Amino acid sequence: MGDVMNIDSIISRLLEVRGARPGKNVQLSEGEIRGLCLKSREIFLSQPILLELEAPLKICGDIHGQYYDLLRLFEYGGFPPESNYLFLGDYVDRGKQSLETICLLLAYKIKYSENFFLLRGNHECASINRIYGFYDECKRRYSIKLWKTFTDCFNCLPVAAIVDEKIFCCHGGLSPDLTSMEQIRRIMRPTDVPDQGLLCDLLWSDPDKDTMGWGENDRGVSFTFGAEVVAKFLQKHEFDLICRAHQVVEDGYEFFAKRMLVTLFSAPNYCGEFDNAGAMMSVDDTLMCSFQILKPADKRKK
């Protein structure tokens, strides 16, 4: 691989479009993107699959290729390394600029590997992003081979994080198979996301106020879980809060089960079809949580 990767140059080109008309692309070379995938994959594998992080940090939910909204999040929260970040997955698909989005996130991971963290979402999986837009974007702008390189990278992402032993973070939610944190630590990477079981549930399950215990999930994958499941899980592991993403919520964040769980969603005006706000959660060093909101853009005059 002849490309020497200049990470600072890559980041500065990705940030050059700040203030440009939303939708302007940044076309890195295919070799540079391959380099981002390979180097970040190395780093993911050198760090645990269950991250143990320290506050202060900012936690973000789904981005889904809404690159200009990702830039707005950083403008609001502080561009790395000004703030520490944990993203909860779903970087690609649905939005128009999955490539810029994932490239900036991987570049920051490489440059600030101890202060910038990315978890795996259910869309960081070949069978899903083959269908919902990322494959087509890779094929149109680069090559199918590059999409496969991303798959190899995504298969190595960590799947959960614990902040200061008190906040449990993952993309989707809990699993009926999850009884000890050691089970997460034992998941071997690289791995695809299976159709069922612990890893699938961490990336796919949803809280549901009408569910007692565990229920069927309308997604046709994984389960729903009720407030009592959340309470028992927190009590058993001495956690204070579950922080997850995976569902659009109107205000960008939404509590469940008497504030024992929070859903974060960071893509405002999701897909151009919703009027939702986007939010990120700021956790200070005393573990106090506050929310920074990206309001949805005003409906453009037709």
From Swiss-Prot:
This is Serine/threonine-protein phosphatase alpha-2 isoform. Its cofactor is Mn(2+). GO terms for biological process: adult locomotory behavior; axon guidance; chromosome condensation; chromosome segregation; learning or memory; locomotion; mitotic cell cycle; mitotic metaphase chromosome alignment. GO terms for molecular function: metal ion binding; myosin phosphatase activity; protein serine/threonine phosphatase activity. Its main location: cytoplasm. The gene is Pp1-87B. Mn(2+) 1 binds at D62, H64, D90. Interacts with Nop17l. Interacts with uri; uri inhibits Pp1-87B phosphatase activity. Interacts with Rif1. Mn(2+) 2 binds at D90, N122, H171, H246. It is found in: Cytoplasm. The active site is at H123. The keyword Cytoplasm applies. It comes from Drosophila melanogaster. Keywords: Cytoplasm, Hydrolase, Manganese, Metal-binding, Protein phosphatase. GO terms for cellular component: cytoplasm; cytosol; nucleus; polytene chromosome; protein phosphatase type 1 complex. Its EC number is 3.1.3.16. Belongs to the PPP phosphatase family. PP-1 subfamily. It catalyses: O-phospho-L-seryl-[protein] + H2O = L-seryl-[protein] + phosphate; O-phospho-L-threonyl-[protein] + H2O = L-threonyl-[protein] + phosphate. CDD domains: MPP_PP1_PPKL (cd07414).
